Structure formats: C-alpha cells, structure tokens
Amino acid sequence: MENYAKGNVLRVHCYKHNGKIHRTWDKTTVLDETDDYLVCGNNKVKITESTKRTHRTKETAIVFFYKRRWFHVTAQFKTNGLFYKVDIASPFLYDEGVIKYIDYDLDVKIFPDGSFRVLDKNEYKYHRKLMKYPDKL
C-alpha cells in the first residue's frame, strides 16, 4: 500500500539497469503528492554508495520524483544560489517505505544563472552498451 502522506519519512534506493543497487539515501520526507509526481525534501542525509562508501549531502534539497516520466528533478539550495539537477531515470516505484528507480547516468546540472552542463556522457555511453539500454533512451 502506498503511503505518501505529508511528513512521512521514506528511504530511496537507486538501481542500475542491470538490477544492481547503485546508491541509497537513508531518509527523505514527503512534502507533497500529485497524480504526476511525489515531492520529497531532505537535508544532510546519509548516502551509501554501491562500494559501501558513505557520505552526507551538503545542503537542503527538494526532489520531484515522477510517476510516469523518465527523469526526476532535484533543487539544491546552496550558499551561492539555487541549482537544479535533472537525472535521466525510470519512473519511480514505491515498495514498503522505499522509493525505487533506475538511474540511466545522464544528468543535466542547471546553474543559478540559467547556464547548464550535461554530466556523465561517457558513463552513459559505456553503460548503454554494457547493460543494453533500450533504444528509446
């Protein structure tokens, strides 16, 4: 059963296309939900990488996880302005308190002045062949 009530604390699991866990967030708080997306917020949360290395996010962030779109958007509140990161990813699934999605490597970082940079192009090219990403990506 889905439990997206405002204020609920969930976890986040990010997978790769081959089904292996890529990273996890220990918590995120539900801020809102619509028919299209789930909005969550976090601040200095613990992230565990697939290598078991852990670190904490440096700033407050709000994430829009989409139910039917192949990306999600993170707004990062940094000391030098508001940054956005758009991650190419599967629509999320909810499973017993965990938001789950597949990461497809490509990201777009948008700076406070509106400029942007596409990130991880080489990682995408490599994983696309290795993991046989669908052509529609």
Q: How would you name each of these model-derived features?
A:
Residues 38-41, 80-88, 115-122:
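Short, well-ordered strand-loop elements centered on a beta-strand within folded domains, enriched
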Residues 45-48, 92, 124-125:
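Short, surface-exposed beta-strand-loop junctions and turns on beta-sheet-rich folds
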Residues 104-137:
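A hydrophobic, small-residue-rich beta->alpha segment in the mid-to-C-terminal subdomain
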Residues 1-58:
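Charge-rich, low-complexity N-terminal segments
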